[in-house]
């Protein structure tokens, strides 16, 4: 059964997509069956993997809008063992289901957890229903952050959401493992030596 890793941060430009794409490619290069789900409507995971956008193809956002099953959006990539569920750049964040467990239920009920070793979910820099769906589906959360004082506020906002989700999951008997990874570290600057608290 697949482990689900969510890569998230409240702040845009924090390296979420680069981290997601590179981890997915590395896991696939090491023989793992990987599925990368792009919840960010910018659609940069597809670009990073060399997958061309195709009109009227199923997307993760079409799943949230109820247009098709999640499994119908799985696409091949040029990387052996690496699949992608692409984003829809025209998705309206106000539309779609408000159910927080929709993604978790679909991953299980559609058999997606059994056909992959690792599922990586790249999230948008927002605190919305898509992020909550990702977090409730997750086994692990990775928070890339730039060690700079402005990035600290986004991490603090996300920590409150992680606490809420973690508390609910603890009541269900499951745990959410969270890790932080500094990115874009400049060791010649003082901020590269200290992490925000």
Where are these regions (language model features)?
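P-loop NTP-binding core
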Residues: 1-197
């Amino acid at each position: 059964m697949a482990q689900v890793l969510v890569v998230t941060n409240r702040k845009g430009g924090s390296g979420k997509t680069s981290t997601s794409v590179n981890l997915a490619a590395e896991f696939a290069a090491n023989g793992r069956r990987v599925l990368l789900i792009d919840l960010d409507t910018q659609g940069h995971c597809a670009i990073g993997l060399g997958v061309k956008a195709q009109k009227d193809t199923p997307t993760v956002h079409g799943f949230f809008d109820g247009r098709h099953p999640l499994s119908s959006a799985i696409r091949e990539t040029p990387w052996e063992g690496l699949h992608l569920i692409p984003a829809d750049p025209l998705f309206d964040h106000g539309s779609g289901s408000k159910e927080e467990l929709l993604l978790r239920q679909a991953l299980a009920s559609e058999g997606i957890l059994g056909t992959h070793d690792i599922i990586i979910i790249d999230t948008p820099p927002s605190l919305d229903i898509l992020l909550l769906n990702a977090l409730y589906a997750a086994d692990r959360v990775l928070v890339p952050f730039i060690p700079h004082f402005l990035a600290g506020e986004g991490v603090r906002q996300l920590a409150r959401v992680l606490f809420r989700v973690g508390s609910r999951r603890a009541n269900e008997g499951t745990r959410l493992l969270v890790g932080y990874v500094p990115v874009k570290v400049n060791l010649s600057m003082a901020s590269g030596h200290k992490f925000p608290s």
